[in-house]
Regions:
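Metal-dependent phosphoesterase signature
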Residues: 15-37, 60-71, 86-87, 99, ...
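Asp-based, Mg2+/Mn2+-dependent phosphohydrolase catalytic module
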Residues: 2-3, 7, 70-90, 101-130, ...
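Active-site neighborhood of HAD-like aspartate-dependent phosphohydrolases
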Residues: 1-54
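Substrate-recognition element of Asp-dependent hydrolases with the DxDx(T/V) motif
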Residues: 39, 43-79, 90-102, 141
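Short glycine/serine/threonine-biased micro-segments
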Residues: 11, 59, 63, 130
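Ser/Thr-centric signal marking residues that sit
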Residues: 14, 57, 148
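A short alpha-helix capping/helix-coil boundary motif
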Residues: 19-23, 58-59, 92-93, 115-118, ...
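Short, solvent-exposed loop/turn segments at secondary-structure junctions
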Residues: 14, 60-61, 136, 155
């Protein structure tokens, strides 16, 4: 059986608007989760090309007590329901790391979440992509063996395979590289 190809997406800043700084940098309620239309279009391209889509996200706010694991999981369920009901788009899975820095091998930049999803779902990491807005996302993708796309970052210092100045450019890039 052939392994599936996948596009892994970071969450905050790629799927939804990035929260602020400090304690406010954690999305703690569904009411504060604002889906980016550019992500919806990117997901449409991914699925049209036969790729699976998985969200992999560090959620340190769980370890720090700013948000409960149950609330994070409820937000992810709401996201999946919204994508399916409103856009007829699906995600294969959503994986999050609830740990603080240095407590695990799943928190990006470690590749643990990507490798776990590949093992769980039979994904071909070498034929897959990681999309993120931080260099930790890019490092996780590279360490897992994926090609990488950096969005909204300092293009001059990123080690990503592709670098984009804005989310609005992601659907077109995916159309060209998938």
């Amino acid at each position: 059986m052939q392994a599936d190809r996948c596009v892994f997406f970071d969450r905050d800043g790629i799927v939804n608007t990035s929260p602020g700084a400090g304690v406010d940098r954690y999305v703690t309620r569904w009411d504060d989760f604002h889906l980016l239309p550019e992500f919806v279009e990117a997901l449409r391209v991914v699925r049209a090309h036969g790729y699976q889509a998985v969200i992999v996200t560090n959620q340190r706010g769980v370890a720090l007590g700013h948000v409960s694991a149950e609330d994070v999981e409820a937000m992810h369920k709401n996201l999946r329901d919204l994508l399916l009901k409103s856009y007829s788009l699906d995600l294969l899975d959503v994986q999050y790391c609830p740990h603080d820095v240095g407590e695990c091998d799943c928190r990006k930049p470690a590749p643990g979440m990507l490798k776990a999803m590949a093992a769980k779902h039979g994904l071909d990491l070498a034929a897959s992509f990681m999309v993120g807005d931080a260099e930790t996302d890019i490092e996780a993708g590279q360490r897992a063996g994926c090609r990488t796309i950096r969005v909204n970052g300092d293009e001059s210092v990123s080690k990503a395979d592709w670098r984009l100045a804005a989310m609005k450019d992601l659907p077109d890039l995916l159309e060209r590289v998938l």
